[in-house]
Regions:
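Core structural elements
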Residues: 153-156, 347-362, 424-432
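Short, hydrophobic beta-strand segments
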Residues: 156-162, 384-391, 435-441
Length: 505
């Protein structure tokens, strides 16, 4: 029987927001701040919300306008308090307003008559990557790279089994030691979970730690094994709080009367076959997790590779684009996709394009076609979707860019304005340098194009992505130059300082 292992899961608390607070010499736990690109309009997603602002029921991935609206609601209540305490100021128009505001939670709690304000910090992705790297190096002072798995920019899994006897520490003590050093070096607070497998470590961090008191620095560390998991979480709701249990899965479970992990565990004792009928091979994972089991360890997750691969480009446009300008964006995205395939030495069998139309097409009253509902319950035209398959796998720009443009023309309604574009390269495989040829194929021309792509890629890698651009990228509405300066679709920003940002009242 294999020896029981001990895993840590560590999550940096509101990471992007915390970095912005620390760089401004502000307390990440008490400063009201959101990370969002306000220049993209209030529909932009908040990449992070500070803990104190979350306490006003603003979710971590809200749209900026949702945060704005919630703050207005809070301030409406606070203004009534200020009026009752005779601390509000009456303007010339006879309306009351706050005498002062604050973005600090402690100050706001001390004086309920103050208005709630907050900082909107533009994202600086390069800075976040730099801080994440610094924190990763802190972990490496205690464990080997072989025993740590970066799950995301702000979250890691660590197998600490062999280190506990070495350091003469418990898992809790080792976790606290690492988290304290991260806090000392960066000013960023972390939450940790300890488990007898990766799944339980993740749940200890995501669910259990959120319901225990924090220490004076805001640090929370929780532990789970199979027994305590069943005791603490078998009746926990909603099921979407559990790792790898999404809304679609939960909906199907609930249709069979399964509302908790305890329900699922009990159902599996007599209805296992039915679970496999519903979920296929994924039923095995669901059943294991219901009982608190997770067979995969550090070696397995590090060696995992998806069985099928695709590469995608997507963007939400800052405003509604007319059809001709949207086509320009599709060509730019296809070019980016081509360079990504070239750099990775991959080819694709087909591309899929999805076009999301703007709601103004319906709001204006002239649209009579098929519709769908967006996440906010608004009626919008039904998205356009299509795929084109190539004669042979390719990464040549002449094929990918031109075929993407033709596909756009074929599937879109030219009268409608566009807001979302997603382009996927499907079934990508290693480029073996083989062409499907016939009597009319100019193989020398194909080789020349491939060498040109590689040369352009070399220039971009050395001098920056904007070193070589097509003239079309300078046309009005083009986004490639801006996107080339981004990381993950968001501004790379500066590397330090954090002086930019707007105070919102």
């Amino acid at each position: 029987m294999a020896a029981q292992r001990t895993y840590l899961a560590i999550d940096l608390k509101s990471f992007y927001a915390s970095v912005e607070c620390v760089d401004r010499h502000l307390d990440p736990l008490t400063t009201n701040l959101v990370v969002a690109d306000a220049s993209r309009t209030e529909k932009t997603i908040c990449l992070a919300v500070s803990p104190s602002l979350k306490s006003y029921k603003i979710p971590g991935r809200a749209r900026l306008f949702e945060a704005v609206q919630r703050v207005k609601e809070v301030n409406a209540q606070r203004l009534q308090t200020a009026i009752r305490q005779q601390k509000a100021v009456r303007g010339e128009d006879g309306k009351y307003h706050f005498a002062s505001t604050s973005f600090d939670a402690n100050t706001l709690n001390a004086d309920p008559a103050l208005g709630l304000s907050y900082i909107v910090a533009p994202p600086r992705m390069q800075r976040y990557l730099d801080v994440s790297t610094q924190i990763y190096k802190t972990y490496l002072k205690y464990v080997s790279p072989a025993d740590i798995y970066p799950y995301s920019i702000d979250e890691v899994f660590i197998d600490v089994t062999g280190y506990l006897p070495y350091y003469h520490m418990s898992a809790h003590e080792l976790a606290m030691t690492m988290v304290r050093e991260v806090l000392y070096n960066t000013g960023i607070t972390a939450t940790a979970g300890i488990g007898t497998n990766l799944y339980l470590a993740k749940l200890a961090m995501d669910i259990v730690a959120k319901h225990i008191p924090a220490d004076k620095d805001g640090v929370r560390i929780a532990e789970l094994d199979e027994k305590s998991y069943r005791y603490l979480l078998w009746n926990h709701r909603p099921l979407t709080d559990f790792w790898m249990t999404g809304p679609g899965t939960v909906k199907r479970l609930e249709s069979h009367g399964i509302y908790t992990m305890g329900d699922l565990a009990r159902f599996s004792t007599y209805g296992e076959d039915r679970l496999y009928e519903i979920f296929g091979v994924d039923a095995e994972i669901l059943i294991d997790h219901a009982w608190g089991y997770e067979p995969c360890g550090m070696e397995q997750i590090k060696s995992y590779k998806p069985s099928t691969n695709s590469i995608s480009e997507g963007q939400v446009l800052t405003c509604p684009y007319p059809n001709d300008k949207a086509k320009l964006i599709v060509r730019e995205m296809a070019e980016i996709l081509m360079f990504r395939l070239t750099e990775k030495k991959l080819v694709t069998e087909s591309i899929t394009l999805e076009i999301g139309y703007d709601r103004e097409n319906v709001d204006k009253g002239g649209y009579r076609g098929l519709t769908q509902t967006d996440r906010y319950g608004r009626i919008i035209p039904k998205a356009a979707h299509g795929t084109v398959r190539f004669d042979a796998p390719t990464n040549l720009g002449s094929t990918i860019i031109n075929e993407s443009a033709k596909l756009f023309e074929r599937i879109t309604n030219p009268a409608l304005t566009v807001r979302r574009i997603t382009l996927n390269a499907n079934k990508v495989t290693p480029d073996e340098g083989i062409y499907q040829v016939d009597f009319f194929t100019d193989t020398k021309k194909l080789e020349k194009e491939k060498k040109l792509q590689q040369a352009m890629l070399g220039i971009k890698n050395k001098y920056g992505k904007n070193a070589v651009l097509k003239a079309s990228s300078y046309e009005e509405g083009a986004t490639m130059r801006q996107r080339n300066a981004q990381i993950g679709g968001h501004s790379a920003g500066g590397t330090a300082g954090g002086s930019d940002g707007k105070l919102q009242k």
